[in-house]
Amino acid sequence: MALAKRIIPCLDVDNGRVVKGVKFENIRDAGDPVEIARRYDEQGADEITFLDITASVDGRDTTLHTVERMASQVFIPLTVGGGVRTVQDIRNLLNAGADKVSINTAAVFNPEFVGEAAARFGSQCIVVAIDAKKVSGPGETPRWEIFTHGGRKPTGLDAVLWAKKMEDLGAGEILLTSMDQDGMKNGFDLGVTRAISDALGIPVIASGGVGNLEHLAAGVIEGHASAVLAASIFHFGEYTVPEAKAYMASRGIVVR
């Protein structure tokens, strides 16, 4: 039987508050990530991804406290990323209740960190987040490069080869964001999603660009992703998770 495809709402959190606005009805405090995560859990989301965009070091304790609160009230897998640079960072997040930890920039600067983390904690809880941008011109063979610092700094690393290297080092999952599409609401970059999904044997989560339910379905059908991640279409109440699952099922996709 085909593995069920996952739907994963994403929360961007700064100093313990959700920052990409949330306009759910019936939420007393739109900024509290725990309340929002509970809503998604009740709606039947498969997982929650929590990206800590707090730049300051002192924000870390707030983050751990938020993760602890979330883990005590939300009973679906929780992935936490943002500023993860050391084995101790990973241990702290897992101890706070995260199920998986996402590594982004630190993997670029020190790829062996991914191998060390996978060896220490198991591949099943190590996610590598990749921010990719298309660098090939019209008529050229499509090529995507890894960027860091929120898509501002090119690394010269080929995104497909890099993802393969991360898998070889022990990553259990790739969270792939297209920097070209992020926030544009006109769909995933299906080219890079498919290229990486087809090259790897581990799950790829497609992220960046969802504006409607067809975009979610296309990420799976055309992008070959194992899971699809979205923020604003769920946060603003445009669609609910059950609506997304029903739509994907209507397109022949196996959902939980």
UniProtKB/Swiss-Prot annotation:
Gene3D superfamilies: Aldolase class I. It is an enzyme of class 4 (lyase). Pathway: Amino-acid biosynthesis; L-histidine biosynthesis; L-histidine from 5-phospho-alpha-D-ribose 1-diphosphate: step 5/9. Its main location: cytoplasm. GO terms for cellular component: cytoplasm. It catalyses: 5-[(5-phospho-1-deoxy-D-ribulos-1-ylimino)methylamino]-1-(5-phospho-beta-D-ribosyl)imidazole-4-carboxamide + L-glutamine = D-erythro-1-(imidazol-4-yl)glycerol 3-phosphate + 5-amino-1-(5-phospho-beta-D-ribosyl)imidazole-4-carboxamide + L-glutamate + H(+). Heterodimer of HisH and HisF. GO terms for molecular function: imidazoleglycerol-phosphate synthase activity; lyase activity. It is found in: Cytoplasm. Signal peptide: none annotated. Keywords: Amino-acid biosynthesis, Cytoplasm, Histidine biosynthesis, Lyase. Belongs to the HisA/HisF family. Pfam families: His_biosynth. One of its GO terms (biological process) is L-histidine biosynthetic process. SUPFAM superfamilies: Ribulose-phoshate binding barrel (SSF51366). This is Imidazole glycerol phosphate synthase subunit HisF. It comes from Pseudomonas savastanoi pv. phaseolicola (strain 1448A / Race 6). Its EC number is 4.3.2.10. Transmembrane segments: none annotated. The active site is at D12, D131. IGPS catalyzes the conversion of PRFAR and glutamine to IGP, AICAR and glutamate. The HisF subunit catalyzes the cyclization activity that produces IGP and AICAR from PRFAR using the ammonia provided by the HisH subunit.
